Amino acid sequence: MAPSTRTFVGLDIGTTKISCIVADQNGGGELRIVGIGNAPSEGLRRGVVVDLEKTVASIQRAVDEAERMAGIPIKGVSAGIAGDHIRSINSRGVIAVSRKDNEIGPADVERVIEAAKAIAIPMDREIIHVIPQEFIVDDQDGIKDPVGMSGVRLEAEVHIITGAVTSAKNICRAIQRAGLKVYDLVLEPLASSHAVLGPDERDLGVALLDLGGGTTDVAVFFEGSIRHTAIVPFGGANVTNDIAIGLRTPIDKAEAIKIQYGAALAALVSHTESLTVNGVGGRSDRQISRHLLASMIEPRMEEIFVLANKEVKKNHFVEMLGGGVVLTGGTSLMPGVVELAEQVFEMPVRLGAPQGLGGLSANVADPRFSTGVGLVLHAARADVGEELFRDRRSAGERKAGFDLRRWFSDLF
């Protein structure tokens, strides 16, 4: 590999699968997917580690597969984090500009963001991201970059995302036990937004729903900035469980039935279509209609969308969504999902998948890989100082790896 080539690795640690995406970037800035690894996820529930050793083994399988395909060793990753422990809040900071000539410098921007971060956070929680939404200079709002402007008073409106310390700590430990450095932790819907949303959608207003196995992650964008994030504690695994109970069949059989025959909107499925459900415990096989299967799936999918819509409606965000709703994640591939979402949200809905990359990009042009590809894109932008999200570490600290003892030092 040429010396001028940079390598970036995204690790999507999901409830049902783990994906490792490897990309390289040449001197011209073009990103090419060069390695992909997937493994069934074991040891996690709703994005939270419940069995460390099983999680480590799953990570190793996905990373080993990606390494073999890419032909290079993987030393560290940008990892996704999700789960119903995630919380978010909007905050504002205010400072007086420090220079005598009233010119705003980078140090002023850092100070005002630190002021905005000065909120009461429980000891068992940690800041994951601090995302500037806009700056206000002497009551002039809507400013994206105030450096070089003149003013006496500088304000910043930021979006702060926090997570449970133990949950973040266990994700990091699992990755490190797999022999890898953690260069960055990125909230999964924010990573996915890199891969599936365009600048126009972010400006116009859009809600992104990442329909995963254990959770559904919600992110609302307006005027180019993140305005709200939330986690709905239901996903594709709940649909599978509903099918298993309704058809009295094992989870693995229910998952296969969901993938092959599932539909989220019963009205779109003919009553005449049928499928075979394998008998268990010596019972004979039986035939059911696909419409009956869809009628088992639809209530859960509707519940997910209703809960997500409640989040979107908070603080009247729904009035800002000129770009409608974008669905991504593995569960979004189910037939009828877009149509059902349009009924619940009462606005245009589209499916989002990663686009515009080189190399093996055709292999990841699928909603299931949005988070993994988004993590790679985030890492590439952070490498040149273009990241959209801030955390507690400098670029140098990020490249050196995630220091658990330092990040969680407040607890000890």
Residue ranges and their predicted role:
Residues M1-T15, I21-L208, S225-I226, G236, ...:
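Nucleotide/phosphate-binding catalytic cleft detector across ATP-hydrolyzing
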Residues T16, G214:
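Conserved Rossmann-like nucleotide-cofactor binding loop
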Residues K17, A82, G163, G262-L265, ...:
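Glycine-rich phosphate-binding loops at beta-strand->alpha-helix junctions
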Residues F222:
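A cytosolic small-molecule/anion-sensing beta-strand core signal
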Residues V306, K310-G324, M334-L351, A380-G385:
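ATP-binding/phosphotransfer module of carbohydrate and carboxylate kinases, centering on a glycine-rich
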Residues A308, L327, L375:
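Hydrophobic, well-ordered secondary-structure elements that form the walls
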